Amino acid sequence: LVDKHGHAFRLATPEPALIALHHIDRDAAGQIRTEFATPIHENRDRYLLHSLIEESITSSQLEGASTTRRVAEAMLKEGRKPRDHGETMIFNNYRTMEQLRSLRGEPLTPELILELHRMLTLDTLENHADAGRLRRTNDVNVVDNRYGTVLHAPPHFEELPERLARLSAFANADEHSTPFVHPVIRAILLHFMIGYDHPFVDGNGRTARALFYWSMARSGYWLMEF
């Protein structure tokens, strides 16, 4: 993975990070254990539904959805169609998270990234044609809204196809690849690179979180589903 100047990113793993990775490996992967008599699989669907709803609402609220949690939960549980922009963001996120469960065994491709973005942003963008389409200009910047300061100018839009192809290859590597990258770090870097490249006019945060979820699930971190 490289920055917009072609320089390779460097990864540092200080001791606190290694400890955190150990805890995640211990508690979020492997066999499901429970101290209760009732097998966890009997409650799995209920827990999973609740988790998907919570993730969909929280992720959308981070992006500005103003729908209340109570209204959003009712919409998803009742299966009714969204009535406004905020509800549409939550509905799209929920539908995409459901789809990701079946896609975790699939390799990541630029086409899949575009499709995930399309699903997440359908009917929520100022220009509906931008859903599932790479940005075509360089007027997208990361800005401090308090002062209007440009914090980050993403790579040139003409570089995005190649950068997504490179990112997909990185995402598909496994524990036998060289150099070894811990699966959790790989998922974090996927999230980071979408934010760094900002390949879309909007919805980059939602897409980054979806790819993080996909990567963690693909690597066997079952707790991420809950």
Model-inferred region functions:
Residues 1-226:
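FIC/Doc superfamily catalytic core
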